[in-house]
A protein has these predicted regions:
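Phosphate-binding chemistry for phosphorylated carbohydrates and sugar-nucleotides
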Residues: 1-153, 160, 166
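Catalytic-core signal marking the mid-to-C-terminal active-site face
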Residues: 153-252
């Protein structure tokens, strides 16, 4: 089976490897002729997978799965950015190792990785950074590590995905006026939730025992991006909306 093999100079769909852009290959996978599909972006630094049943593996779980394999063979620390899934922390702790969070951005992740001597790291958008190869996001390295792990585990791709902690993410934004002092609002939110675990190296991240919310201001427009994660989609959306209401009240 082949898809889009005619080099016309145009992408057949939005090249960002997200579920909404990958309907054709997901349908192809439902035919049961392949064990896994790999999808990369144009510069091959983001990796998404599709299971044998045609369902998305989940971009956030690319790094989690690769880290599971690396940690099993090379114990050490891990790093991802503040907006990435908590599942990496869980897998890291399973091996008795330390997880560290960095500010968003590849350069921030790699700087933190070097600082703590991480054996694997990356970003939740499917970006895998494997220092034993090089300090940059590399989807081909990610594919090699994923296939190695799949071979060692002897599972279907969907079974492998089901073996990891289940988290769901919600992404929202609060639109403010140009006159709004966004930094002051973030400082007030931080104060309101001071009894929770707070990280302010890149906006404000509030870590609750069973969920988290990460607030980041835009440098180009008066908005605050709100990322949240919890054990169900509903809980992730609920905590995100809750914090958004707090922001809107503070902005009045």
């Amino acid at each position: 089976e082949k898809l889009y093999c005619e080099p016309t100079g145009n992408f057949q769909h939005n090249p960002e490897p997200l579920e909404k852009n990958l309907g054709d290959i997901m349908n192809l996978m439902k035919g049961g002729k392949a064990d896994v599909a790999f999808v990369v972006d144009p510069d091959v630094d983001r990796l998404a997978m599709i299971c044998e049943d045609g369902k998305m593996y989940g971009e956030e779980y690319t790094l989690v799965t690769v880290a599971d394999y690396v940690l099993k063979h090379t114990p050490g620390n891990t790093v991802s950015n503040l907006s990435s899934t908590r599942a990496l922390r869980d897998v890291t702790r399973k091996y008795g190792q330390e997880y560290y969070a960095s500010a968003v951005g590849e350069v921030n992740v790699t700087t933190k990785m070097k600082e703590v001597g991480a054996v694997i790291g990356g970003e939740g958008n499917g970006g895998v950074i494997y220092p034993a190869s090089h300090y940059g996001r590399d989807a081909l390295v990610g594919i090699a590590l994923f296939l190695s792990h799949l071979a060692h585990e002897g599972k279907k791709v969907s079974e492998l995905r089901a073996s990891y902690p289940a988290y769901f993410m919600a992404k929202n934004r609060v639109d403010l006026t140009p006159e709004t002092d966004v930094d002051a609002i973030l400082a007030k939110v931080k104060e309101l939730y001071k009894n929770e675990e707070i990280n302010d190296i890149d906006g404000v991240k509030i870590d609750f025992p069973d969920k988290w919310v990460h607030l980041r201001k835009s440098n180009t427009e008066p908005i605050i991006r709100v990322y949240s994660e919890a054990a169900t989609p509903e809980a992730a959306e609920e905590i995100g909306q809750q914090i958004m209401k707090v922001i809107e009240e503070l902005a009045k």
